[in-house]
From Swiss-Prot:
Keyword set includes Disulfide bond: yes
Cleaved signal peptide residues: 1-22
Cysteines joined through disulfide linkages: 30-59, 37-51, 41-60
Function according to Swiss-Prot or TrEMBL: Has antibacterial activity.
Gene Ontology molecular function terms on file: lipid binding
Name recorded for this polypeptide: Beta-defensin 13
Principal localisation: secreted
tRNA-binding in keyword set: no
Location relative to the cell: Secreted
Protein family membership: Belongs to the beta-defensin family.
């Protein structure tokens, strides 16, 4: 019975780590678009996407000057 509980605990940990893979990919895309992950975009920045992390949900990029 103890081994069963260890297997279930391991599966729960794997399920919790699965969404983290998407977060890393979104952060990579944000860096590729020359942006950065922040909690809130500054007034001179625009939101170009999401990083989907708890602490840094937005991908921000500096606005181009015309």
């Amino acid at each position: 019975m103890r081994i069963f509980s260890l297997i279930v605990a391991g599966l729960v940990l794997l399920i919790q780590l699965h969404p983290a893979k998407g977060t890393l990919y979104r952060r990579f895309l944000c860096k590729k678009m020359k942006g950065r992950c922040e909690t809130a975009c500054l007034s001179f920045e625009k939101k170009i996407g999401t990083c989907r992390a708890d602490l840094t949900p937005l991908c921000c990029k500096e606005k181009k000057k015309h």
